[in-house]
């Protein structure tokens, strides 16, 4: 946790989804967006400069070579919010290890808030 809230990064390739999620994150006083990556090659650079508590992750990032980044490079303590049109149960690709929450597109602000509230409650219970 940062002094004024929980740090997060956004990994997403769709412009409208990026804009919407950046707006949702900015509406919450307890979240601090440290950066956004739209290509696999940008993820590692972003993680070199920050260690986010929460990672908003689109599972399908078409830009960049699969060798540019793999999920084992994420901080082990990070909490993942998977943002996708495909439910995780139907996804056949790689999924990161760790605590995972899911938001299906299109994402309403109400669903976003419920997800974040649940994550923050879990963090507070764990830290008690």
Protein language model regions, located:
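Two-component/phosphorelay signaling modules centered on CheY-like receiver
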Residues: 6, 15-38
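A short, hydrophobic beta-strand element within the central beta-sheet of small alpha/beta folds
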Residues: 77-89
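Short amphipathic alpha-helix used as the core "switch/output" element in two-component signaling
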Residues: 65-77
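Acidic, metal-coordinating helix/loop segments flanking the phosphotransfer/catalytic sites
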Residues: 22, 36-54, 62
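The C-terminal output helix
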Residues: 117-128
């Amino acid at each position: 946790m940062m002094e004024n809230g929980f740090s997060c990064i956004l990994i997403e390739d769709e412009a409208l989804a990026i804009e919407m999620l950046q707006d949702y994150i900015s509406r919450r006083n307890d979240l601090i967006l440290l950066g956004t990556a739209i290509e696999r090659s940008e993820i590692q650079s972003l993680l070199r400069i920050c260690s986010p508590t929460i990672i908003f992750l689109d599972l399908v990032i078409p830009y960049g070579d699969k060798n540019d980044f793999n999920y084992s490079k994420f901080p082990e303590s990070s909490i993942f919010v998977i943002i996708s049109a495909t439910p995780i149960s139907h996804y056949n690709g790689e999924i990161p290890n760790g605590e995972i929450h899911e938001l299906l597109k299109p994402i309403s602000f109400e669903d976003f808030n419920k997800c974040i509230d649940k994550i923050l409650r879990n963090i507070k219970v764990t830290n008690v």
